[in-house]
Amino acid sequence: MKHLKQLRERYFSTLKHSDTEETIDLWFYRPIGFLVALLGERLNLTPNAITTAGIVLGIASGLLMFPASLKLNLIGFLLLVLADVCDSADGQLARMTKSYSTLGRILDGVSSDIWFASIYLCIALRFYPEWGIGIWALTIGAAVSHAIQAAMADHYRQFHLFFVNGKGGSELDDSESVAHDYRSISFKAEPVRKLSLWFYWHYTKVQETFNPQMTRLRVCLRLQSGESLSPTISELVGHATLP
């Protein structure tokens, strides 16, 4: 009984915040992700390893959307669900083991974009013989709007967590800081990190471009009090930014 209580407490410690957790996550993805995170901890896996596994599963899911076979398509859908489980488990493992890294944040940010690029591309190729060039216009429009929506949802979520949990409980970054990190390293010395930071830099710029008021608010607050926010400000802005 005591062990179950400890396990339950540990599970809840891997969640971000009740304000930002979606119903399907709480009932499905988080519990399964927690089991995967426990397995990863036992096997000494890093959160980035689980993220990479999710990327592979997501790409495979897209490839299985290409054949006109319901059986293969259903397998592809199952792989997409497993990729989503990995997307949950990597963050849970990071919070469980306190294994945070900029590279992990970058990989986590672009992983779902890579899956859906694979899915959109393979679906477009599947329907091209019947739809012709029009399928590409539809696919590009859907992919771009999807990417922007996902980036905005992530930004609003992290912005809210910044005021509710503080800097340590949020993954909110700004493009200037990311750009500084990007320029501080050479491609020759750290090619993977350099390339990852380039993508993440532009990802944060897109977020700030579509949310200029939030960016200005954070800059003003930083000029006044740095990253340490007063309880009053945290409560007011946290309430105003509820999802």
Where are these regions (language model features)?
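Select subsegments of transmembrane alpha-helices in polytopic membrane proteins
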Residues: 47-52, 108-116, 235-243
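Basic, amphipathic juxtamembrane/active-site segments
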Residues: 91-133
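C-terminal membrane-associated helical module and adjoining short loops/tails
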Residues: 1-32, 158-243
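Short juxtamembrane and helix-loop transition motifs at transmembrane-helix boundaries
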Residues: 8-17, 34-44, 70-73, 96-104, ...
